[in-house]
Amino acid sequence: MPCTNPNVFQMNTKKPTMWGSLNYLKKQNLEQTIMDGVKKGNLALLPCGKCEYCRKQIADQWATRIELEAQKWNDVIFVTMTYDEQHVPYGEIVKGNQSIQSQTVSKRDVQLFLKRLRKAYKKPIKYFIAGEYGDRTKRPHYHGIFFGLKPEDGVWYKNQKGNAYFKSEWLTNLWGKGFVDFSPAAPGSYAYVAQYVNKKAIGAEQSAKYWMQGREPEFRIMSKGIGEEYLKEHMNEILETDNITCAGGRQKRPPRYFDKLLDKDTNKDTENYFKAHSDELRAVRAKRRRNAILSLANLEQNTSVPYSTYLEIQKEKDKQKQKWREPKETL
């Protein structure tokens, strides 16, 4: 399924950047614009970043980066941190003369825990942590992947869906606010954590809803450079195939982060995705653009409805799903 609300651009391919000079096109004449762009080879449909497809792509890219990072460490664990009644944080909002309190996630609690953990453990670690609310109780809790962390006092306490879960008094005391369990991490848990960051609507509108309830918005925090070492070591291979082979032979597109790494030395404005100053990145993106136009041409040829109608059908499917393969939370 494609992005259901793409931004349509026309490219001036004579410009020295990969995408050329991008001119935003209005969508009133979408069909004719696409037909003309496919024929001329100067069309770019850039993802909106908000629809179901785009959200899933963002989560998939994070899951891929986490999996690549995990290959560089001997110890990788999946950790869940929850609150006891004594320590669960509350936010407050005043409506009229009434004060309303709601349980809330706390990024500060997680940051202080990480500070204590680094001081106590003393070995290098990396992490990817998502803070969120339970679907049923709305209770705040945290899931994380920790690289390089191995609690020595882990004690088995249950098996669930084929995974062994352990408790650690040392890790629980460092958290200091309730309960902690962990299990050996695997590709399934990488995707599990990555999906949490996108399972609900993202952006200012959703954040405002939380603030109106006196709650902090759901969040994610992570170490810098997740997956960077792997991407740098395999750069030539990735450039040649524009694919990454993950566990089980799964083929993944390189995360957008790879483009930034590839162009980092030649492009000081690394945040500008459309300025590809390195020859390697220009070549990779030119190939992607050609493939995208060919796919669009095939879709136009083999689909009985206009592309704009096709997108509307996909949007309706998106609305009906509401939730896409999201983790089933029991909290």
How would you name each of these model-derived features?
Residues 181, 286-331:
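C-terminal non-catalytic accessory extensions
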Residues 46-49, 73-78, 124, 177, ...:
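Sequence-level motif detector for i,i+2 pairs with an aromatic at +2
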Residues 52, 80, 128-130, 145, ...:
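Residues in well-ordered beta-strands of folded domains
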Residues 37, 82, 87-98, 159-162, ...:
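Intrinsic-disorder/low-complexity loop/linker signature
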Residues 57-136:
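Signature for HUH/AEP ssDNA processing cores
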Residues 135-140, 146-286:
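Conserved His + Asp/Glu catalytic blocks
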Residues 1-67, 297-301:
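DNA replication initiation on ssDNA origins
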Residues 49, 107-111, 191:
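A structural signal for well-ordered alpha-helical segments within the folded catalytic domains
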